[in-house]
């Protein structure tokens, strides 16, 4: 029997959640996703040293060098993956719609200067109200977006309503919150709060005919991945890709468009309702804030690393 990674690829598009070229080449994913944390890690790799030096020598600010490196690493990844790479807008812009739009267009411009068409890039934006509005504008201009740091059903409904190309609902970080804030410390995969969340979002999208791609993200174990087999896409770390590859057990499809469970009413919220819904969800509020702070911290780490090399 083939390994579980190959079986999973029959049901879901597998995406590599890394900037490590060697790992991407080994596991042969469709796409790859990056974020400030992964870029900071990748920029310190010996193999990327020439890209770092080129970015520093060809730009006149650390901010510009960061953008150049993000795109340069994206270009290297696109030499290997047949699909797309996700490149993230500076998380410090998470509450600024216009600045997010401008940064997204700038990143796409850098890719086009490097000979990469916008069809091979997804712009990552945090799933704040402002980020979702930025995606709505960008999608209408033909720039596809990946809405990340998504923890609530309200966020998912708003992203679909805005016409986002893809969402990245987080699984493991939801599990982390429940383990830290409730008495229950262990969950079977199908009862995992992150798995339950993504399953509901997937079913909602299929029931209402949304084309927005559901890409489960942030996994803590292979059980979560197996419980979401059939999700449109799954972005997976090299460690978990390796564990799936080493396992020759049977993997069955769980999610299908045809069997989307009980009917879920359509949810359309204006800004006030969206903000209230998410404020009522302590897990989503805390994890979104924490996620933005974490990405900002690693963006600053990347900037400081570049300053040390300048």
From Swiss-Prot:
GO molecular function annotation: transaldolase activity
Subcellular location per the Swiss-Prot or TrEMBL entry: Cytoplasm
InterPro entries xrefs: Aldolase_TIM, TAL/FSA, Transaldolase_1, Transaldolase_AS
Xref: CDD domains: Transaldolase_TalAB (cd00957)
Keywords: Cytoplasm, Pentose shunt, Schiff base, Transferase
Pathway(s) the chain acts in: Carbohydrate degradation; pentose phosphate pathway; D-glyceraldehyde 3-phosphate and beta-D-fructose 6-phosphate from D-ribose 5-phosphate and D-xylulose 5-phosphate (non-oxidative stage): step 2/3
GO biological process: carbohydrate metabolic process; pentose-phosphate shunt
Enzyme class, spelled out: transferase
Active site as annotated: 124 (schiff-base intermediate with substrate)
Chief location bin: cytoplasm
Cellular component, GO, one term: cytosol
Signal peptide: none
EC number: 2.2.1.2
HAMAP family the record matches: Transaldolase_1
Function field: Transaldolase is important for the balance of metabolites in the pentose-phosphate pathway.
Similarity comment: family membership: Belongs to the transaldolase family. Type 1 subfamily.
Subunit record text: Homodimer.
Matches recorded under NCBIfam families: PRK12346.1, talAB
The protein's name: Transaldolase
Organism: Teredinibacter turnerae (strain ATCC 39867 / T7901)
The encoding gene: tal
């Amino acid at each position: 029997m083939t390994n579980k990674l190959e079986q999973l690829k029959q049901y879901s598009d597998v995406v590599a959640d890394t900037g490590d070229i060697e790992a991407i080449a080994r596991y042969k994913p469709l796409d790859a996703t990056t974020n400030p944390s992964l870029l900071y890690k990748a920029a310190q790799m010996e193999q990327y040293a020439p890209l770092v030096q080129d970015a520093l020598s060809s730009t006149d600010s650390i901010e510009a060098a960061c953008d150049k490196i993000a795109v340069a690493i994206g270009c290297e990844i696109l030499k290997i993956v047949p699909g797309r790479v996700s490149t993230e807008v500076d998380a410090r812009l998470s509450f600024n719609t216009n600045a997010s739009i401008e940064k997204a267009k700038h990143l796409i411009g850098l890719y086009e200067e490097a000979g990469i068409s916008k069809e091979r890039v997804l712009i990552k934006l945090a799933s704040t109200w402002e980020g979702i509005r930025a995606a709505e504008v960008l999608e209408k201009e033909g720039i596809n977006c990946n809405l990340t740091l998504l923890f609530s059903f309200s966020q998912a409904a708003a992203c679909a309503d805005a016409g986002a190309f893809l969402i990245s609902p987080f699984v493991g970080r939801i599990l982390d919150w429940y383990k830290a804030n409730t008495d229950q410390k262990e969950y079977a995969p199908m009862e995992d709060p992150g798995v339950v969340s993504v399953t509901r979002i997937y079913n909602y999208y299929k029931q209402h005919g949304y084309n927005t791609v559901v890409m489960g993200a942030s996994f803590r174990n292979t059980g979560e991945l197996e419980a979401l087999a059939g999700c449109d896409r799954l972005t997976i770390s090299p460690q978990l890709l390796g564990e799936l590859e080493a396992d020759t057990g049977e993997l069955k499809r769980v999610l299908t468009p045809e069997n989307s469970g009980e009917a879920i009413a359509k949810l359309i919220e204006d800004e006030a309702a969206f903000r209230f819904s998410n404020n009522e969800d302590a897990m989503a509020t805390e994890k979104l804030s924490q996620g933005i702070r974490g990405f900002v911290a690693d963006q600053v780490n990347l900037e400081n690393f570049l300053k040390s090399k300048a």
